[in-house]
């Protein structure tokens, strides 16, 4: 499954001066797993947006969203749990391992950040998270 195949547009609004201190592999896994999750579960003909919308002296604050179907409110508290699947009928072949968002959360926490998820009022799912700035 790919961006082109599903007619997905990505808007990257991360500024060129954003520098994050941390483990490259874990930082990559945050964005990769969020993108994979949107591709696999948000549906077709959607937009994915990535934005560092705010910063303070220690952290950058990011919004990662899609304009897809979102999820039922009852699942929001558990989507970061290991092996949790919104649709229990999914198998590893058809719906992943249930580890992607757990990996995202643990990678964010490893970098002293926080993450939360919410449904967007116009549809889709949004992840708000923080990552520590590179200190010079």
Q: What do these predicted ranges mean?
A:
Residues 66:
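Acidic ATP/Mg2+-coordinating residue in the GHKL
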Residues 71-83:
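Short conserved segment of the HATPase_c
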Residues 44, 112-113:
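Conserved glycine-rich
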Residues 9-19, 53-55:
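Conserved catalytic submotifs in the C-terminal HATPase_c
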Residues 38-39:
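Short helix-loop "hinge" at the ATP-lid/N-box region of the Bergerat-fold HATPase_c
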Residues 100, 104:
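Short alpha-helical Gxxx[C/S/T] motif in the catalytic ATP-binding
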Residues 45-58:
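Short beta-strand/loop element within the Bergerat-fold HATPase_c
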């Amino acid at each position: 499954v790919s961006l082109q195949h599903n007619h997905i547009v990505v808007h990257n609004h991360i500024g060129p001066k954003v520098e994050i201190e941390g483990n490259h592999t874990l930082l990559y896994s945050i964005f990769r797993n969020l993108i994979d999750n949107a591709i696999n579960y948000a549906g077709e003909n959607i937009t994915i947006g990535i934005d560092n919308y705010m910063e303070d002296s220690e952290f950058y604050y990011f919004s990662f969203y899609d304009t897809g179907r979102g999820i039922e409110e009852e699942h929001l508290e558990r989507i970061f749990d290991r092996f949790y699947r919104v649709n229990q009928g999914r198998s590893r072949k058809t719906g992943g391992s249930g580890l992607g968002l757990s990996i995202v959360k643990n990678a964010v926490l490893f970098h002293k950040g926080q993450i939360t998820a919410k449904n967007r009022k116009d549809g889709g799912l949004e992840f708000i998270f923080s990552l520590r700035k590179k200190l010079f």
